[in-house]
Amino acid sequence: MNAIPYVVEQTKLGERSYDIYSRLLKDRIIIIGSEINDQVASSVVAQLLFLEAEDAEKDIFLYINSPGGSTXAGFAILDXMNLIXPEVQTLCMGLAASFGALLLLAGAKGKRFALPNSEIMIHQPLGGVKGQATEIEITAKRILKLKHDINKIIADRTGQPIEKIAHDTERDYFMTAEEAKEYGIVDGVVEKK
């Protein structure tokens, strides 16, 4: 059973009940706590746009605990983060792997954080294909382009040379929160709020 908790808030007009995610959204907090797919991307992008419309000056907080997922869905979130006027602060709580790590490092410079026991993992994109040789070749070219584009984003956002990124992403490259800070993926490790 996947129950979403509700909270009750006292107001001048009485009590008001919210699901926990709606209540957090009032505080400009968005949570990605699952694999990144089209449904998650649509929800996160809608929340980003809503919060921008509410106040284009205030930061938005994106909390990430995700094994990654679809690159197309991940890029939808990343592009929306870059599009909107408010800065997006990112925080890894648990795991930010694959595209989850890209979203973590895509936060505003100086505002990317991880909790002490977080784990961050970068790697090259995964893909599979079957079909005719031409279709396989087209897909292989697309995956190689994605690999280059992702490595460039990581290099640009971390300050690491692209050659190091290309080497490190050949396989799953896991980091602790402190190692991710040294690498340039996050700007700090948060012990207390």
Curated annotation (Swiss-Prot):
Catalysed reactions, as listed in the record: Hydrolysis of proteins to small peptides in the presence of ATP and magnesium. alpha-casein is the usual test substrate. In the absence of ATP, only oligopeptides shorter than five residues are hydrolyzed (such as succinyl-Leu-Tyr-|-NHMec, and Leu-Tyr-Leu-|-Tyr-Trp, in which cleavage of the -Tyr-|-Leu- and -Tyr-|-Trp bonds also occurs)
EC number(s) on file: 3.4.21.92
PROSITE patterns named among the record's database cross-references: CLP_PROTEASE_HIS
Domain of life of the native organism: Bacteria
Keywords, comma-separated and alphabetical: Cytoplasm, Hydrolase, Protease, Serine protease
Localization annotation: Cytoplasm
Name this polypeptide is given: ATP-dependent Clp protease proteolytic subunit 1
Native source species: Bacillus cereus (strain ATCC 10987 / NRS 248)
Gene for this chain: clpP1
